[in-house]
């Protein structure tokens, strides 16, 4: 974690923490670090539907033009759309303006290298070092060497064509309900599934700049649950504001999370001989039931720290092709370089159609342990990792569990929160364990 970069780029309240001035510097210095060996480097910029997107885009573009870049504005597009197009169009870098699932007042900036992958910790550290130098010593081209900016709104269609090619077959006879969170997938998801011959019902597809993630999308799947039952759909697919997450809903209205989707898809891909080394990469937040279900299918697992970037790093390092998070960041590395909600949706519907089963039948093969996650708002989230009393209560609870459950306490990567999570055999035990730890965290960490 750096001064500006969190686990998923630079984030903050737009025009307060993430100001146009900061966005200009991020564009100028970030663009330089990623493109310094190139004359007239090509950089793609996309954004979600937040009202602050235009403001930050203008500042970012100015920063990139000041180092002589050729900027191509993609308009409203998902984060994985930017990632895919950056690589497909041989650009030197891609930039996405979004705060993902966060509320509308927040926004963020994340970079992709020319290979379509997110930046390494070392690259982010170099950008931060240059931003904090007392004097800006970067080149300042003038005249014909200044950067250029063009619109490339056709990029969304190029990404749509790519997605359609990942479907194993058409989706005739499947009724899909979509919730696009009034976000970046609003203009593309309906076309995608209609073009694949699914019957489509939609909600959350009317962005107005202020309603992104507001009671809809992957962080509010209960809205889609009701919609699926109302429309008698076979499956519900909920995306977040920037389209890099997927949470599903079965035909009965039950929520199917990222762990379950990973398990369902991994089992199918293994049966097809397409799961590399019969291994799935997940984070420490994945449910114990997920690992037990994988073991039953003789699928191995690798665990990483929380954050899809760490999942991707592990996948790249050892050549695995399926990974993700319980939160719905799912990575299918044979097709794209980052979490992709629309791609994940296609993989899941592929599996659903090939199986001949309902989604509830597929999801029920994985028995989840009861899990409770409580977020505690604190003044300094990082102190939790060294606090002696917090450590002591965690140790006490783990002894009580006696190996039949687990505890996870960690600072959020993107918000001023400490996350306290417990898994146990019963919901009552989860409540008891989490309450005991949260009480100590609140007392010790200066909870707001």
Curated annotation (Swiss-Prot):
Its EC number is 5.4.2.10. One of its GO terms (cellular component) is cytosol. InterPro entries: A-D-PHexomutase_a/b/a-I, A-D-PHexomutase_a/b/a-I/II/III, A-D-PHexomutase_a/b/a-II, A-D-PHexomutase_a/b/a-III, A-D-PHexomutase_C, A-D-PHexomutase_C_sf, A-D-PHexomutase_CS, Alpha-D-phosphohexomutase_SF. Its cofactor is Mg(2+). GO terms for molecular function: magnesium ion binding; phosphoglucosamine mutase activity; phosphomannomutase activity. It catalyses: alpha-D-glucosamine 1-phosphate = D-glucosamine 6-phosphate. The modification Phosphoserine is found at residue 100. SUPFAM superfamilies: Phosphoglucomutase, C-terminal domain, Phosphoglucomutase, first 3 domains. One of its GO terms (biological process) is UDP-N-acetylglucosamine biosynthetic process. Activated by phosphorylation. The keyword Magnesium applies. Mg(2+) binds at residues 100, 240, 242, 244. Binds 1 Mg(2+) ion per subunit. The active site is at 100 (phosphoserine intermediate). Keywords: Isomerase, Magnesium, Metal-binding, Phosphoprotein. The keyword Magnesium applies. HAMAP family: GlmM_B (MF_01554_B). Catalyzes the conversion of glucosamine-6-phosphate to glucosamine-1-phosphate. Belongs to the phosphohexose mutase family. This is Phosphoglucosamine mutase.
């Amino acid at each position: 974690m750096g001064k500006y970069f969190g686990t998923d780029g630079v984030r903050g309240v737009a025009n307060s923490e993430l100001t146009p001035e900061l966005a200009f510097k991020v564009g100028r210095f970030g663009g330089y670090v990623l493109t310094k060996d190139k004359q007239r480097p090509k950089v793609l910029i996309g954004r979600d539907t937040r009202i602050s997107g235009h403001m930050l885009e203008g500042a970012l573009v100015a920063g990139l033009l000041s180092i002589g870049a050729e900027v191509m504005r993609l308009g409203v597009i998902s984060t994985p759309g930017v990632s895919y197009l950056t690589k497909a169009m041989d650009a030197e870098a891609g930039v996405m303006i979004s705060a993902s699932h966060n509320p509308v007042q927040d926004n963020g900036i994340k970079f992709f290298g020319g290979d379509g992958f997110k930046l390494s910790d070392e690259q982010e550290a170099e950008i931060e070092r240059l931003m904090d130098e007392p004097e800006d010593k970067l080149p300042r081209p003038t005249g014909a060497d200044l950067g250029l900016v063009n619109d490339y709104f056709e990029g969304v269609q190029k990404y749509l064509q790519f997605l359609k090619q990942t479907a194993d077959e058409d989706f005739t006879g499947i009724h899909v309900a979509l919730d696009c969170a009034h976000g970046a997938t609003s203009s593309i998801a309906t076309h995608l599934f209609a073009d694949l011959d699914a019957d489509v019902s939609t909600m959350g597809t009317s962005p107005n700049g202020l309603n992104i993630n507001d009671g809809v999308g992957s962080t509010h799947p209960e809205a889609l649950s009701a919609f699926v039952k109302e429309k008698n759909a076979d499956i519900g697919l909920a995306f977040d504001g920037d389209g890099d997450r997927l949470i599903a809903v079965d035909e009965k209205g039950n929520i199917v999370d990222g762990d379950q989707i990973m398990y369902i898809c991994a089992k199918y891909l293994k049966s097809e001989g397409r799961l590399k080394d019969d291994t799935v990469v997940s984070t420490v937040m994945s449910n114990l039931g997920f690992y037990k279900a994988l073991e039953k299918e003789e699928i191995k697992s690798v665990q990483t720290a929380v954050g899809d970037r760490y999942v991707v790093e592990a996948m790249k390092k050892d050549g695995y092709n399926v990974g993700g998070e319980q939160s719905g960041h799912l990575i299918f590395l044979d097709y794209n370089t980052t979490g992709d909600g629309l791609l994940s949706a296609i993989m899941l519907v592929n599996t659903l159609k090939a199986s001949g089963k309902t989604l509830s039948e597929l999801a029920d093969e994985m028995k989840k342990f009861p899990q409770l996650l409580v977020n505690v708002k604190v003044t300094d989230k990082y102190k939790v990792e060294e606090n002696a009393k917090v450590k002591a209560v965690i140790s006490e609870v783990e002894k009580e569990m006696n190996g039949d459950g687990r505890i996870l306490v960690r600072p959020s990567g993107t918000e001023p929160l400490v996350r306290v999570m417990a898994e146990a055999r019963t919901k009552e035990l989860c409540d008891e364990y989490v309450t005991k730890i949260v009480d100590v965290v609140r007392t010790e960490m200066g909870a707001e």
